[in-house]
From Swiss-Prot:
The active site is at S120 (for autocatalytic cleavage activity), K157 (for autocatalytic cleavage activity). Represses a number of genes involved in the response to DNA damage (SOS response), including recA and lexA. In the presence of single-stranded DNA, RecA interacts with LexA causing an autocatalytic cleavage which disrupts the DNA-binding part of LexA, leading to derepression of the SOS regulon and eventually DNA repair. GO terms for molecular function: DNA binding; serine-type endopeptidase activity. This is LexA repressor. GO terms for biological process: DNA repair; DNA replication; negative regulation of DNA-templated transcription; proteolysis; SOS response. Belongs to the peptidase S24 family.
C-alpha cells in the first residue's frame, strides 16, 4: 500500500486528537464539518482507507463507532517475497505485496514472508498455502527450519549437518532428504520463526 496522503493523515490525526481530548470518537458528520466535506460518502472513503491501513476499527451501527488500533493490535507489515517449496525447490519470485503478522512473531533483525507450496513440512505444521515468517540471516543451527537457495531455487526444510555434509530434511516421512552436493550453489536465506494460516493482506 502507498503511504497516507496529507489529507488522510489530517483526518486520522483529527480522529485521534478528538478521542484523546473528548474520550470518544467524532461522528461522521463532525468529521465532514471539520474538513468541509460535502457528503458523508467522502468521510466513509477516508475511514475505509484508514481501516485498511490497520489504523482504525469501525462499527457502522454506532454513531461514534470508531476506535484506534494500537501498534500491537496492528501487527507488523512484512514484505511477501514470493513462493517457497515445501516439496522440491522452486524459484522465489518477488511479489509486490505485504502481509500483516502478529508482532510477537517478529523479534530483532530483518524479516520477510514466503508462501509455502507443497506438503513436505506437514510434520512441522507447515502445509500447502501457509505463509512462513522468516528472519533473514546467512547462518543457522543444526535442526532449525530454514529457507535456503539451492541452485538458485528456494526451499524450506530442516537443516542437518553431518560432519562436512549438509542435508535439507523434510518433515514428511514419505519424502527423502536433499543432499547438498555443491556448497557453492547453496545459501541460507533465513530461519523460519512463525507460520500464518489465516493472514491479513495489507
Amino acid at each position: 500500500m502507498s503511504p497516507l496522503t496529507p489529507k488522510q493523515k489530517q483526518v486520522f490525526d483529527y480522529i485521534a486528537r478528538h478521542i484523546g481530548e473528548q474520550g470518544f470518537a467524532p461522528s461522521q458528520q463532525e468529521i465532514a464539518r471539520a474538513f468541509g466535506f460535502r457528503s458523508l460518502g467522502t468521510v466513509r472513503n477516508y475511514l475505509v482507507r484508514l481501516e485498511r491501513e490497520g489504523l482504525l476499527e469501525r462499527n457502522w451501527n454506532a454513531r461514534r463507532g470508531l476506535q484506534l488500533r494500537t501498534a500491537s493490535e496492528r501487527g507488523m507489515k512484512l514484505p511477501l517475497a514470493g513462493t517457497v517449496a515445501a516439496g522440491k525447490p522452486i524459484e522465489a519470485i518477488e511479489i509486490p505485496d505485504v502481509i500483516e503478522v502478529p508482532p510477537t512473531m517478529v523479534g530483532s533483525g530483518e524479516h520477510f514472508v514466503l508462501r509455502v507450496a507443497g506438503d513436505s513440512m506437514i510434520g512441522d505444521g507447515i502445509i500447502d498455502g501457509d505463509y512462513v515468517v522468516v528472519r533473514k540471516q546467512a547462518t543457522a543451527e543444526h535442526g532449525q527450519t530454514v529457507v535456503a537457495l539451492l541452485d538458485n531455487e528456494a526451499t524450506v526444510k530442516r537443516l542437518h549437518r553431518r560432519n562436512d555434509r549438509i542435508e535439507l530434511h523434510p518433515a514428511n516421512p514419505s519424502m527423502q532428504p536433499i543432499v547438498v552436493t555443491d556448497p557453492d550453489n547453496f545459501r541460507i536465506e533465513g530461519v523460519v520463526v512463525g507460520v500464518i494460516r489465516h493472514y491479513r493482506s495489507a
